[in-house]
Amino acid sequence: MGEHYQYLIDRFKDAQKQFADLPHEQQPEVMGDISWVCMFDMLHYAYQHLEECKLILCCSEGTRFSGLIDEMVEIEVEGTHAYQRVLAELGRPPPPLDPTLEHILITGMFHTFFELVIHEMPLPDAENYVKEMRAFYTAGWMKIMGQ
């Protein structure tokens, strides 16, 4: 299970790095694009390794694998803060965001995503749901960020 846990974490970290490495002026134009490509990649990976990924998501309590979503949330929170600093640098500072609300929203996003795997949605449906999730979460974050 370790290799599957690590793949998901590393793929997500890579997407965060790709976005952070973009020129700051370009980041608002593509906000969400890289991370949602990453979500599709993680979805396909999880479906290719369904049993192992479901074990991580559903049966890993008490093991080192139980923190997958929490670790991803921490990475996303850090990325969100970095993006807020970029927006401020560009003269488009976002309004303050309550840290508890931020944590709840990000945690909810990952739980929503991984529900597709847990419930073994047919892959074409899951792909469509990820597209819908992208529209929903991107619009919400744009509103919260005052963009």
List each model region and its residues:
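Alpha-helical structural segments
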Residues: 1-21, 37-41, 67, 71-74, ...
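Solvent-exposed, amphipathic alpha-helical segments
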Residues: 7, 11-18, 52, 108, ...
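Amphipathic alpha-helical segments used for helix-helix packing
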Residues: 15-20, 24-26, 45-63
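Amphipathic alpha-helical packing segments from all-alpha helical-bundle domains
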Residues: 33, 37-48, 63-89, 100-107
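Hydrophobic/aromatic-rich alpha-helical bundle segments in the mid-to-C-terminal region
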Residues: 83-136, 145
